[in-house]
């Protein structure tokens, strides 16, 4: 029943905005860097209702930070970082300060080989993070607090959505009998990678809050939007609200003189279980408006811990770029 409900909701382009509470913001002190870390609580709606969540503006703690260069679109070099060859291949990603990122497919002592293209530059500042996994984000022993179950039908379901293929990547749940994350075929799934721009869908068995921890995302964020009417589930990648009018989507989406002429941003209401607001970029007035042509205000935000739906009616995939809505000073 849960799976059928999920398909029905996604077929209606459903997405649920969640509230997030930052319960702590601490200063950790490794040998060479000071990292802001956070703990967030995100409510899950029970009774088989569906919620989309983000990773709460948190990432796996960086393992390296420094200057470098991008001599080709698929390589990044640094000056004598003394990396262990192969240490980051398939398990880590690199992120530039502007938000551009790529998974790492190989590395030598001073060069990273990249899975996807980065902009060529003689000088960049970058970080290396572990790719987030289900075990890493939610805990190998379910420290996040999902409702577990003996099988797929008895607990909360975590569903992965891939905008590039417009389909599910799989259904996961915490098996409380074997005490591990599993997929629909009961295979171990705790190592499943959760990419930074990947939508997360939760179908709640009971109403509760999950609790996640991580390093606070401080840099810009970049992701890809599907075209030709495709649905992209775009997270708020920060621990603060992001105003619709300041989110930077006008650089990636096509605006129009009316709502019907443009690409759309859709905000979900968890109480109504339906879309409550629809936005488009009005090219005549150069501003974001809702479907009733009211200008977007400071109160129209993507709340922390949530995601929104983007429907790009125009042709071709596009890259969206969002700046952090705050400044962190070490």
Outline where the language-model segments fall.
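Charged, amphipathic alpha-helical scaffolding segments
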Residues: 172-216, 276-326
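Bacterial N-terminal signal peptides that target proteins for export
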Residues: 2-15
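Surface-exposed interaction/gating patches
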Residues: 136-155, 160-165, 218-276
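Bacterial N-terminal signal peptides
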Residues: 14-24
């Amino acid at each position: 029943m849960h799976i059928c409900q999920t398909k029905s909701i996604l077929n209606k382009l459903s997405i649920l905005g969640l509230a997030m509470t930052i319960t702590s913001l601490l200063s950790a002190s490794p040998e060479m860097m000071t990292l802001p870390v956070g703990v967030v609580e995100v409510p899950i709606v029970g009774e088989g209702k569906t919620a989309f969540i983000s990773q709460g503006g948190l990432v796996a703690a960086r393992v390296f930070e420094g200057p470098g260069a991008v001599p080709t679109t698929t390589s990044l070099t640094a000056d004598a970082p003394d990396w262990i060859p192969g240490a980051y291949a398939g398990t880590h990603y690199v992120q530039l300060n502007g938000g551009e990122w790529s998974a790492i497919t190989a590395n030598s002592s001073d060069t990273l080989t990249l899975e996807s293209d980065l902009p060529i530059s003689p000088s960049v500042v970058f970080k290396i993070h572990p790719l987030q996994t289900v075990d890493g984000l939610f805990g190998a022993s379910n420290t996040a607090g999902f409702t577990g179950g003996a099988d797929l039908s008895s607990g909360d379901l975590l569903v992965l959505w891939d905008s590039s293929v417009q389909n599910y990547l799989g259904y996961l749940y915490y098996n409380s009998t074997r005490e591990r994350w599993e997929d629909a075929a009961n295979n171990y799934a705790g190592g499943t990678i959760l990419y930074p721009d990947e939508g997360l869908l939760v179908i709640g068995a009971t109403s509760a809050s999950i609790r996640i921890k991580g390093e606070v995302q401080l840099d810009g964020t970049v992701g890809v939007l599907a075209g030709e009417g495709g649905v992209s589930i775009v997270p708020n990648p920060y621990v603060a609200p992001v105003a619709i009018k300041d989110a930077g989507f006008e650089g990636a989406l096509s605006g129009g003189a009316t709502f019907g002429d443009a690409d759309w941003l859709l905000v979900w209401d968890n109480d109504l279980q339906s879309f409550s607001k629809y936005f488009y970029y009005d090219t005549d007035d150069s501003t974001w408006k809702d479907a009733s042509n009211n200008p977007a205000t400071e109160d129209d935000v993507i709340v922390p811990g949530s995601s929104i739906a983007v429907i790009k009616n125009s042709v071709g995939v596009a890259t969206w770029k969002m700046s952090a809505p705050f400044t962190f000073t070490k």
